[in-house]
Swiss-Prot record:
Pfam families: GH3, GH3_C, GH3_M. This is Indole-3-acetic acid-amido synthetase GH3.2. The keyword Ligase applies. Its EC number is 6.3.2.-. Induction: By auxin. Down-regulated by blue and far red lights. One of its GO terms (molecular function) is indole-3-acetic acid amido synthetase activity. It comes from Arabidopsis thaliana. PANTHER family: GH3 DOMAIN-CONTAINING PROTEIN, INDOLE-3-ACETIC ACID-AMIDO SYNTHETASE GH3.2-RELATED.
Length: 549
């Protein structure tokens, strides 16, 4: 389904750099015949991993064609691969899933039995991720000129990591990237200059990191051409941080000295080269702007040259759009790429479109993609009636239809169900474009957390035991994610049944214990976001209707 390419027509511009032209031509090359690229990718994956323990089970005998692969290798979920992943995690270095050594695990925001899923990664995966990153600014430059004349204020953070019993790092995908040489030793690029120094981004103390990044952004406010964070919720947390700390930030700027709250040696040393003298004029400006009760349009007041916000506002993040519009004065919101811990998938070729119109073009060189037609009768029905012969190739999906994404990666995931539900919106050349609809089976989500019905049910059951001895029990509950507060939080409504009125009405002390019990019962992603990252606020637990018998 080839169409006239807007990228191709824009590439003839005299202002387009040679580097950008090369990147845009690569996108055109990959999307003209995605089926051919996909065939090559699958062949490479199966050839290099033919001697792995996993693939040997299916008697491929060196055959790498798609028909044989799809007829012999089953579609799987994380639970199916858990034994193999556990062996690798424990230190088994034999070629179980991949012929290349597994160098680390990327922790997924999805969970299994309450703990983060571990996605195997090989060293060259960093190169693939870097390749996708390298395509983002060439596309953006087609729509927003002059980004090389200033800087980006991006609030970027590393999250806590651990090591498996076998000694492999286990950490979120962006933490892995920020700590890699690809990021730390990235060559100078005028289109990718950040106000935040690496020392602040790499600080594991999120409070010190945020303070230093915000201070740098304020000191360079006239140079800032774009603001961003990974998620919309992250940018709103930065605004909330400014609301709570602008007096201290203004004092640092006024005196030319760094707050004592910054004690990380690397940040202190770096900031001594940035905060070099008092700036009374800037400090007075900040006090004047931030002391106002109305913060509508605060972003463009402080950073007047900002052209757009670079944040994810699709899926669960769409709930933050109105608040971002309020604080930004209606700035465009750019969603630039689609990625996960399993693999990086694609890019938005129209990054300045409305959030409701965001579609991602899958780059066929990143992995081998299949699509399971989504059953609208419900996820349970779709699970029960899985027909592996119904999976559709990347080039054969149909506009308007919804699919669940299934991937095969170089690192050793074969026909793995990612759990993302996508809708086909069109094509770029012959490559399909998808709108992210939702994450499968997710009931509650504030940021990167994903809580399903079973997890919430277990948490409610555990908490309800605290007052069962008094003869009170939960007969009904409902929930929602409250995102009008920053940070957002879960709200759970309970309908209680007690022996009498005094039993049905719970004290604040008991409610507090119930909230704590529920939070401790939720998955590890929620607990980390709640305690370490502070990206989720305290649980709101409310007794709605009390009944007694």
């Amino acid at each position: 389904m080839a169409v006239d390419s807007p990228l191709q027509s824009r590439m003839v511009s005299a202002t387009t750099s040679e580097k950008d032209v090369k990147a845009l031509k690569f996108i055109e090359e990959m999307t003209r015949n995605p089926d051919s690229v996909q065939e090559k990718v699958l062949g490479e994956i199966l050839t290099r991993n033919s001697n792995t323990e996993y693939l040997k089970r299916f008697d491929l005998d060196g055959v790498v064609d798609r028909k044989t692969f799809k007829s012999k290798v089953p579609v799987v979920t994380y639970e199916d691969l858990k034994p193999e992943i556990q062996r690798i995690s424990n230190g088994d270095c034999s070629p179980i899933l991949s012929s290349h050594p597994i160098t680390e695990f990327l922790t997924s925001s999805g969970t299994s039995a309450g703990e983060r899923k571990l996605m195997p990664t090989i060293e060259e995966d960093l190169d693939r991720r870097q390749l996708l990153y390298s395509l983002l600014m060439p596309v953006m430059n087609l729509y927003v000129p002059g980004l090389d004349k200033g800087k980006g204020l991006y609030f970027l953070f590393v999250k806590s990591e651990s090591k498996t019993s076998g000694g492999l790092p286990a950490r979120p995908v962006l933490t892995s990237y920020y700590k890699s040489d690809h990021f730390k030793r990235r060559p100078y690029d005028p289109y990718n200059v950040y106000t935040s120094p690496n020392e602040a981004i790499l600080c594991s103390d999120s409070s010190q990191s945020m303070y230093a990044q915000m201070l740098c952004g304020l000191l360079m406010r006239h140079e800032v051409l774009r603001l961003g964070a990974v998620f919309a919720s992250g940018l709103l947390r930065a605004i909330s941080f400014l609301q709570n700390n602008w007096k201290e930030l203004a004092r640092d700027i006024s005196t030319g000295t760094l707050s004592s709250r910054i004690f990380d040696p690397a940040i202190k040393n770096r900031m001594s080269k940035i905060l070099t003298k008092p700036d009374q004029e800037l400090a007075e400006f900040l006090v004047g702007v931030c002391s106002q009760e109305n913060w509508e349009g605060i972003i463009t007041k402080i950073w007047p040259n900002t052209k757009y916000l670079d944040v994810i506002v699709t899926g669960a993040m769409a709930q933050y759009i109105p608040t971002l519009e309020y604080y930004s004065g209606g700035l465009p919101m750019a969603c630039t790429m689609y990625a996960s811990s399993e693999s990086y998938f694609g890019i938005n070729l129209k990054p300045m479109c409305k959030p409701s119109e965001v579609s991602y073009t899958i780059m066929p060189n990143m992995a081998y993609f299949e699509f399971l037609p989504h059953n609208h009768d419900g996820d349970g029905a779709a699970e029960a009636s899985l027909d592996e012969t119904s999976l559709v190739e990347l080039a054969n999906v149909e506009v308007g239809k919804e699919y669940e994404l299934v991937i095969t990666t170089y690192a050793g995931l074969y026909r793995y169900r990612v759990g993302d539900i996508l809708r086909v919106t069109g094509f770029h050349n012959s490559a399909p474009q998808f709108k992210f609809i939702r994450r499968k089976n997710v009931l509650l989500s504030v940021e990167s957390d994903k809580t399903d019905e079973a997890e919430l049910q277990k948490a409610v059951e555990n908490a309800s035991r605290l007052f069962a001895e008094q003869g009170t029990r939960v007969i009904e509950y409902t929930s929602y994610a409250e995102t009008k507060t920053i940070p957002g939080h879960y709200v759970i409504y309970w309908e209680l049944l007690g022996r009498d009125q005094s039993n049905a009405l719970m004290s604040e002390e008991v409610m507090a214990k119930c909230c704590l019990e529920m939070e401790e019962s939720l998955n590890s992603v929620y607990r980390q976001s709640r305690v370490a990252d502070k990206s989720i606020g305290p649980l709101g637990d409310t007794c709605g209707t009390e009944r007694y018998v």
